[in-house]
UniProtKB/Swiss-Prot annotation:
Protein's organism: Listeria welshimeri serovar 6b (strain ATCC 35897 / DSM 20650 / CCUG 15529 / CIP 8149 / NCTC 11857 / SLCC 5334 / V8)
Gene3D superfamilies tied to this protein: Apc35880, domain 1
Annotated protein name in UniProt: Coproheme decarboxylase
InterPro entries per record: CHDC, ChdC/CLD, Dimeric_a/b-barrel
Role, per record: Involved in coproporphyrin-dependent heme b biosynthesis. Catalyzes the decarboxylation of Fe-coproporphyrin III (coproheme) to heme b (protoheme IX), the last step of the pathway. The reaction occurs in a stepwise manner with a three-propionate intermediate.
Cofactor: Fe-coproporphyrin III
Gene: chdC
Positions contributing to Fe-coproporphyrin III binding: 133, 147-151, 174, 187, 225
PANTHER family: COPROHEME DECARBOXYLASE, HEME-DEPENDENT PEROXIDASE YWFI-RELATED
Swiss-Prot/TrEMBL keywords: Heme, Heme biosynthesis, Iron, Metal-binding, Oxidoreductase
Cofactor binding, per record: Fe-coproporphyrin III acts both as a substrate and a redox cofactor.
EC assignment: 1.3.98.5
HAMAP family: Coproheme_decarbox_1
Biological-process GO terms, alphabetical: heme B biosynthetic process
Length: 251
């Protein structure tokens, strides 16, 4: 049997995509709308406290197209903590007007294809560079791109039948492309084998949305993607600071 990849695991992630029920929202009187927005604001203030003490992260983006209107991206140190955030959000009055369209569960991961190289032989969980990857600070970039992906198991193109050294080489070469976009694109990889329908959830952040097109295009021509990758739907959006939520919902 081929050697399975080992991973270092950090924060658990929830991408929660919602569509706004504008027809129902318009039926509310302004006073009720304001009460709901105030309740949402208090919820987000509590989320900010968690972020400030280093126990999690979160961000909100406005999604383009008809797949969703918003994504709430939350990171926590356990599935229980993540579920608590999800349940509390669903109990907000405004949640009745934010209809779920898609979600994705994963855990920030770094594989031993890369982790041992980054840690340089020390305990990787004590390495600052590794910890920054596993427990990332979400950048306030203008744009987000999220997509799920898996590795193929199709005849001769079966990633999981490749020897470890060949997989390491392919991932290393693939990673060189990503590193060439340092400073332009920040990437968070969430492992989701056994958690969701695909094997990874990829989240990209950038101040220039065209960088998403460039990096994904370049990676498509790399063997690790061209031969062995399968992709789900792509979601792209614009940063929505919490202080701008009221403006979004104002009729």
């Amino acid at each position: 049997m081929n050697e399975a990849v080992k991973t270092l695991d950090g924060w658990f992630c929830l991408h929660d995509f919602r569509s706004i029920d504008w027809a129902a929202w318009r039926e509310l009187n302004p006073a009720n709308q304001e009460l709901m927005l105030n309740e949402l604001s208090h919820f987000l203030s509590d989320m900010e406290i968690t972020k400030n003490i280093g126990e999690g992260e979160h961000t909100i983006y406005s999604i383009l197209g008809q797949k969703a209107d918003l994504v709430f991206f939350t990171l926590r140190d356990s599935l229980e903590a993540l579920n608590e955030v999800e349940n509390r959000f669903n109990k907000l009055a405004i949640a009745d007007y934010l209809l779920p369209t898609y979600s994705y569960i994963s855990v920030v991961e770094l594989s031993n294809y890369l982790a041992s190289h980054m840690a340089g032989g020390e305990d990787p969980y004590q390495n600052k560079g590794v910890r920054a990857r596993l427990y990332p600070a979400l950048p306030p970039k203008k744009h987000i791109c999220f997509y799920p992906m898996s590795k193929k198991r199709d005849g001769a193109d079966n990633w999981y039948m490749l020897p470890m050294d060949e997989r390491q080489k392919l991932i290393r070469d693939h990673g060189l492309i990503g590193r060439s976009y340092a400073g332009k694109v920040q990437q968070i990889i969430g492992g989701s084998i056994g958690f969701d329908d695909y094997e990874w959830g990829v989240t990209l952040f950038s101040d220039d949305a065209l960088e998403f097109k460039r990096i994904v295009t370049e990676m498509r021509f790399d063997e690790a993607s061209a031969r062995y990758a399968e992709f789900g739907s792509f979601f792209i959006g614009n940063l929505l600071p919490s202080e701008n939520l009221s403006k979004l919902f104002t009729m």
